[in-house]
Amino acid sequence: IARKAGLRAVPHGGELLGPEHLREVLDFLKPTRLGHGVRAAESPDVLRRVIDEGVAFEVCPASNVSLGVYSEASGVPVRTLMDAGATIALGADDPLLFLSRLTAQYETLREQGFDDAELAALASSSVEASFADGASKRTWKAEIQDWLAADPSNDDDAEAHGA
């Protein structure tokens, strides 16, 4: 119904109900983006299918922990999804409900050992997964590359790199 009306739909799946639920979401809803989907990491076949079908994951570590999917943010399989080649849009998911902020999600990944290049790749992946127009995506990706190229030894650039 949503597609026929010209609306975008992002079904939620693969969070509380696991990878089998993702199979159903993929079969019946044919999404281009999934709300969560993190438990695809538990099934190599499901994860490969999501990637092969070009479906992006919206990964929200704070809500995954708040909902008890993982006991701590380090358990959220962002690294597994990223290493498999998944398109990931890092998100805060209902900031008023979970009291989460997007910058805190990036800080969490930094604490888990993600370097500047990996954080920039996640930011670019988030832009790519967005429903923004092509010109906006190009602009934002260029800004991400500018951030990555900035010299953290310069006082003005150091703060941007979390120094």
Residue map of PLM features:
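Short, hydrophobic/aliphatic alpha-helical segments
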Residues: 1-3, 76-85
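Structural recognition of alpha->loop->beta junctions
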Residues: 25-40, 80-88, 105-117, 121
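Alpha-helix N-cap/helix-start motif
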Residues: 18, 43, 98-102, 137
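Short acidic/histidine-rich active-site segments
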Residues: 10-16, 81-101
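Hydrophobic alpha-helical scaffolding
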Residues: 12, 36-37, 71, 92-96, ...
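Active-site core of metal-dependent hydrolases
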Residues: 1-69
